[in-house]
From Swiss-Prot:
Chemical reaction(s) catalysed: a ubiquinone + NADH + 5 H(+)(in) = a ubiquinol + NAD(+) + 4 H(+)(out)
Main EC class the enzyme belongs to: translocase
Similarity field: Belongs to the complex I subunit 3 family.
Native species: Caenorhabditis elegans
Database matches in Pfam families: Oxidored_q4
GO biological process, one term: mitochondrial electron transport, NADH to ubiquinone
Bilayer-crossing regions: 1-21, 56-76, 85-105
GO cellular component: mitochondrial membrane; respiratory chain complex I
Topology of this chain in the membrane: Multi-pass membrane protein
Keywords: Electron transport, Membrane, Mitochondrion, NAD, Respiratory chain, Translocase, Transmembrane, Transmembrane helix, Transport, Ubiquinone
Record-given protein name: NADH-ubiquinone oxidoreductase chain 3
Domain of life: Eukaryota
Amino acid sequence: MLVLLMVLVFTLVLLFAFYLINFLLSIKDMGKNKISAFECGFVSVGKIQNSFSIHFFIMMLMFVIFDLEIVMFLGILVSDLSSYISFLMMFIFILGGFYMEWWYGKLVWVI
């Protein structure tokens, strides 16, 4: 247990040190080239800041969340019998979330 605690403390110290070094040594240039969008070497045409639809962002977010939940299911299914209660609770929670998204119309793929 002591070794695990030492590894955790060492990892956190190393993480903080790398973050601090990155913050101190990075170049903070906010020129025109830094804040503009890069489109394969061509000059951008039009307003770039609102170039994506929030609908696709929400769909991506739901995909990532459900994908992570499926990965958690795989870990629960290979464990012992006592974890099936946790599996059923998580499954009911995910089905409830899926039903709410369907009810509010968030699963429509049409723009």
